Amino acid sequence: MKKTNLLLISALFAASTLQAQTTDLTKGLSIWFDKPCSLSGMASFYNYSADRDWEERSLPIGNASFGGNIFGSIAAERITLNEKTLWRGGPNTSGGAEYYWNVNKESAHLLPEIRQAFVDNDLKKAAKLTRENFNGLAGYEDYSEQPFRFGSYTTLGEAYIETGLSEIGMSDYKRVLSIDSALAVVSFQKDDVKYERTYFASYPDSAMVWKFTADKPGMQNLTFSYKGNPEAEGKMVAAGDKGLLYVGKLKNNGMEFALRIQAQHKGGSVKATADGKLVAKGADEVIFLLTADTDYKINFNPDFKDPKAYVGVDPVASTDAMMKAASARSYDELKARHQEDYLSLFNRVKISLNPNAPMTLEYPSIYDLPTYKRLASYRKGKPDYKLEEIYYQYGRYLLIASSRPGNMPANLQGLWANGVDGPWRVDYHNNINIQMNYWPACPTNLAECNWPLIDFIRTLVKPGEKVAQSYFGARGWTASISGNIFGFASPLSSQDMSWNFNPMAGPWLATHVWEYYDYTRDKQFLKEVGYPLIKSSAIFSVDFLWKRPDGSYTAAPSTSPEHGPVDEGATFVHAVIREILLNAIDAAKALGVDAKERKQWQEVLDNLVPYKTGRYGQLMEWSRDIDDPKDEHRHVNHLFGLHPGHTLSPITTPELAKAARIVLEHRGDGATGWSMGWKLNQWARLHDGNHAYKLFGNLLKNGTLDNLWDTHPPFQIDGNFGGTAGVTELLLQSHMGFIQLLPALPDAWEEGSIEGLLARGNFEVDLRWANGQLQEAVITSNAGQPCQVRYGDQTLNFKTKKGQTYTITSVDGKLVKK
């Protein structure tokens, strides 16, 4: 479970008060269904596409380490299980540590020849040399090499609880995920009995809790069983009279893991059987407690000769300790501690969109409609502002459930996966996907959820130094397109450079380290953790560049990730380098260090090849004007400087902003879920709220499954986070050095409010608007920084004191501080 010894995290945020929940959870912020899932996809471990119920209709719970998906079937509850660090691959496969780390090619000596080929306009030669020499040695699929060293995130298995009931005669069925109470609840009537099941995953108690009850005594006749990962060896055995223990080892790398289950009951009996089951008979209620762990330990300084560099936990002992602690508490105490912890984060932000708008659906109350039917109505063009609020807050729920201090970050599917392998290994994709996962973290006041990402970045530094030296003769560290939990930072074996060559993955990740500081102003963090990561990434970026005879700097070879040719100076690469060098300069200034390096970084910035516009007026994606206005590719890499960067803006670079707009017009308003999420943010940065809102609508209509998970297709969680971040950008921006109030408010949201957003400089901001105009902004200074506020063309500057709150209104075209 919690595997990291973290440095002190600044106590930036006050816990919210636990609020009582309504009995009918569908009345709050919830995702719910009126039909149970089928059991047809049970144990489809080798074919995720066959299990549509898991992808489209299951409901996820998690404590960032241990997760599950609730299906709510009647005859047998099915719950898929995941532990965040259960991975195949790494240095402990049969190939050993030397085999695992022997993944880089020594290619730096070829850079002069490639660059000369660009000078000679021999683009084929430059591409060929890059293709053949700047890939790596590790395969990306388990059939491509044995043993499979990159590995994949893999399932912990599935739990089943047979009930002895059937759907015949069932009524009043509801399966609810309450995102404002972090509970999943299944309820239904059967033979004049109301059955209810409640599920949650507790971060403070490192346990998953399931409660089965009914409104009449003696109705719980349950059989718990477990189906393990087929690529593991293990056995379920009794652990006491009412408990089970499964200890397994993955065949690929010998990773050991453990799952414990303990039953508590009122009335009747519960007994563990010799064949690894728990059987309850005639109980009034049964509570299942589950704990899970692996032998994985995070390692920031791995020994490249040690096959067990990432082994350091005894999961049998750790799950036992977790279970003893959890079982010592009552169900009510476990639930209260879980909700208090969750709500201390979730309740920081509240949003209300058009609260007085009349209902437009043909139901007495919008809450009478299950979520998938509301989504179907929304797809037909019927407004549903409450659904938009739910989607926004669901992104925050998913981040809390999949990323908390003490573990690895949210992956391509957050925490939840249902197979031995999954799409793109369910890995850490470093060319936008993992970064997008964390776009909403700071702006929606979940800054501490960044810590798993920061720790992940720290695992890449030592391996990334080898990558930088081998391929570019560079100092510092970098990463490549795909990462795992074992420090993998190298390119993969594919010679398709359009996706496999992205040395800017490291610098892009490092910009998130600066973002965390910029929002929190935690100088201890910056000094001890942040700046060393940023500085080393900046050093790599400078060494990576080619200083041409005319004194300008460019990136050769380079690519625009997943799109187009090997190039002399792809715009994306220059934009990322601008960002990390500016971050490094600001970080060094904040600490009062490295004046010499600051001067060098500024010299590179001053001479870096600038943004270019092409024959269509577009911001060029490559060094040559080869953009196709009919190309609607999902990646919009060359607008990195617009978002998530800050070197393109309608305020500071209006002509380049116009060129960026042309790019977005050419790319269109469709594509994959995550791509629509990115373009939503980019349109918001252009201050075009109506077009951004169109992208938000398209994301919900065309990129969202019935359980509100984002779909590529298939399911990828990044689009959920991109959507939440994009809505925030519509209402508040702070990337240009000042706080912009309602910078891209769409006409559709005529009235509304949002509370608790975080702006850079560590300002908490509440906003209220009516008739499309700002009514009031309430700004709390958490760090005592000077504050500059902008609303439209109005600006206001004032000094602040730490802990003080300031109210801003607009009077006669001027911002006024009360």
Q: Where are each of the predicted segments found?
A:
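Bacterial Sec-dependent N-terminal signal peptides
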Residues: 1-22
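Aromatic-residue-lined binding/catalytic grooves and analogous aromatic/hydrophobic interfacial grooves
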Residues: 21-497, 515, 535-541, 548, ...
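Well-ordered alpha-helical segments within folded domains of soluble proteins
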Residues: 431-442, 503-514, 572-582, 637-646, ...
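Short, surface-exposed recognition loops and adjoining beta-strand edges that mediate ligand/DNA contacts
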Residues: 409-427, 548-562, 740-754
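Non-catalytic carbohydrate-binding regions of carbohydrate-active enzymes
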Residues: 514-521, 525, 529, 537-547, ...
